[in-house]
UniProtKB/Swiss-Prot annotation:
Its main location: cytoplasm. It is found in: Cytoplasm. The keyword Endoplasmic reticulum does not apply. HAMAP family: Rel_fac_1. It holds the Pfam family RF-1. Keywords: Cytoplasm, Methylation, Protein biosynthesis. Transmembrane segments: none annotated. Peptide chain release factor 1 directs the termination of translation in response to the peptide chain termination codons UAG and UAA. This is Peptide chain release factor 1. Methylated by PrmC. Methylation increases the termination efficiency of RF1. One of its GO terms (molecular function) is translation release factor activity, codon specific.
Length: 360
């Protein structure tokens, strides 16, 4: 392992011991905010230190076994050769795991997200496909133990959605979904197509991390136009009695968000403001993403929403992710919610990209 990485591990070990002492300090325990922050950091560092200590132990075992290779007893030498081979294999695995653990962490990985799906080219077929994508992500979320709530929806005339905006809440949501942003294309024969011709339609998906605190994104109330209207969403007869739906326009950028799913105008406003904060944060981050992409071309994670990232070909039962040249013939499984079949290879490719940068 590189000296620079070993040095980083030594620094982390010192920090781990410091955190252990801090979490036992009465003054820290009485301050819940500090205690939670240190506890989170401890939970992040602990697995790295456990693996590092295991690596150090295996390194010592290897050195001991190598010393026995000089023994005059042939049986001892044979046993030592086996131990050396075993220790080297363990070291290789441990070093690879530690390198992954030391990869730069995306501060957004643990956050909830706003998932925006919009029908693009293809008319009714695009709207139907948007509905398919929303069901796909909803089923995947259910398997992950996440919660999905629709904030705003505009249904298509023949099913699906012209647009559907949802909030996905759970553990490491952004970490799993962040590479889903982009243009998704579908190729299939519409039910209304009498000649059996394959039509191509498209939808765009945007995955925005929810900021921890809206205070992190400065929003001047004077720059907002807030409109109320009667909801056409859930809520039964109640929605006909009050203007509970909220539409917020951020005048400097022209960004518009709306929420109509709650009966309470106050709740709709709070959710719309959180969504607006996420969109403004995303806008601020876009320039940084562009700079990174131009400096070093990334196969995965460029963040370009206009980029065609995936094709779903129904006649062939094929899903192709164009960023990593991945083709699977399990379309029904993927569209049925097994998106991990595509997500996991993308994450692996991204990690490989980071590891290559770590070695530069």
């Amino acid at each position: 392992m590189k000296a620079s990485l070993l040095n980083k591990l030594d620094i982390l070990q010192d920090r781990f011991e410091e955190l252990t002492a801090l979490l036992g300090d009465a003054e820290v325990i009485s301050d819940q905010s500090r205690f939670r922050a240190y506890s989170r950091e401890y939970a992040e560092v602990e697995p790295v230190i456990v693996a590092y200590r295991q690596l150090c132990k295996v390194q010592q075992d290897l050195e001991g076994a190598q010393a026995l290779l000089k023994d005059s007893d042939p049986d001892m030498r044979e046993m030592a050769e086996e131990e050396v081979a075993e220790a080297k294999a363990q070291l290789e695995t441990l070093e690879a795991n530690l390198q992954r653990m030391l990869l730069p962490k995306d501060p957004n990985d643990g956050r909830n997200v706003f998932l925006e799906i919009r029908a693009g080219t293809g008319g009714d077929e695009a709207a139907i496909f948007a509905g398919d994508l929303f069901r796909m992500y909803s089923r995947y979320a259910e398997k992950q133990g996440w919660r999905v709530e629709i904030l705003s929806e505009s249904e298509g005339e023949h099913g699906g959605y012209k647009e559907v905006i949802s909030r996905v809440e759970g553990d490491n949501v952004y970490a799993k979904l962040k590479f889903e942003s982009g243009a998704h294309r579908v190729q299939r024969v519409p039910e209304t197509e009498s000649q059996g011709r394959i039509h191509t339609s498209a939808c765009t998906v945007a995955v925005l991390p929810e900021p921890d605190e809206q205070a992190a994104v400065e929003i001047n109330p004077a720059e907002l136009r807030i409109d109320t209207y009667r909801s056409s969403g859930a809520g039964g007869q109640h929605v006909n009695k009050t203007d509970s739906a909220i539409r917020i326009t951020h005048l400097p950028t022209g960004i518009v968000v709306e929420c109509q799913e709650e009966r309470s105008q106050h709740k709709n406003r709070a959710k719309a403001m959180a969504w607006l904060a996420a969109k403004l944060q995303d806008r601020q981050d876009a320039a940084a993403h562009k700079e990174i992409s131009e400096t070093r071309k990334l196969l995965v994670g460029s963040g370009d929403r206009s980029e065609r990232i995936r094709t779903y070909n129904f006649p062939q039962g094929r899903v192709t992710d164009h960023r990593v040249n991945l083709t699977l013939y399990s379309l029904n499984e993927v569209i049925g919610g097994a998106v991990e079949q595509v997500i996991e290879p993308l994450l692996q490719e991204y990690q490989a990209d980071q590891l290559a940068a770590l070695g530069d």
